[in-house]
Design a protein with these regions (language model features):
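Acidic, two-metal ion nucleic-acid-processing modules in DNA metabolism proteins
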Residues: 1-184
Length: 184
């Protein structure tokens, strides 16, 4: 694992102050040391192209059809979730997009209606970069498919997703919702 802090220690003579830990670091340095720092940190870096590809870890491949409100409720015994105790993450494939639309006060959330390979309707939500998602859909399935999905019309979009199931509460109604973290 790459540690930004350890790499910065190798250049410490260039800083007026610095600190951090393996996941993050901060520094102050004079303007004239910016370029020498850039050169040294890149020279010392042991990162490979493979290190720059995000690694996606799931707990288990699990069809969305297997997830129930009861199962999601039982996950609460694993809480609290955070960096050292991540929430359970699963994967499923062959999910057909029947509709997608942007919601949220800032138009920054994508809701999707999906159909599982068993024909089960699924409510999903995506909090990531919507434009990148749309670009992926356009590139893989075409602009017509994207526009059809945005209108709730038949299309050829089929996704594999990494997701976390949740219980959504809206106006006192509870429903199962799948938060998409990664897609392909």
């Amino acid at each position: 694992e790459y540690s930004m802090y350890e790499e910065m220690c190798k250049c410490s003579e260039l800083f007026t102050k610095f600190g951090g830990h393996p996941m993050a670091a901060g520094l102050s340095l004079p303007q004239e040391n910016v370029e020498p720092f850039r050169q040294k940190i890149n020279e010392y870096a042991s990162l490979t192209d493979d290190d720059l590809v995000p690694k996606i870890h799931i707990d288990v491949p699990m069809p969305v059809d297997y997830v129930s409100m009861r199962l999601v409720s039982e996950f609460s015994v694993l809480a609290p979730f955070g960096k050292d105790n991540p929430k359970p993450v699963f994967a499923d494939k062959n999910l057909r997009v029947s509709r997608m639309w942007i919601v949220g006060k800032n138009n920054n959330v994508l809701r999707l209606s999906l159909i599982s390979s068993y024909g089960t309707p699924i409510n999903a939500i995506y909090f990531g970069d919507i434009e990148s998602f749309f670009d992926y859909i356009r590139q893989r399935f075409g602009t017509d498919a994207l526009e059809a999905a945005q209108r709730g019309r038949f299309n050829n979009i089929v996704l594999s997703v990494v997701y976390s199931p949740k219980i959504n509460v809206f106006r006192e109604n509870e429903s199962l919702q799948f938060e998409i973290q990664y897609y392909k």
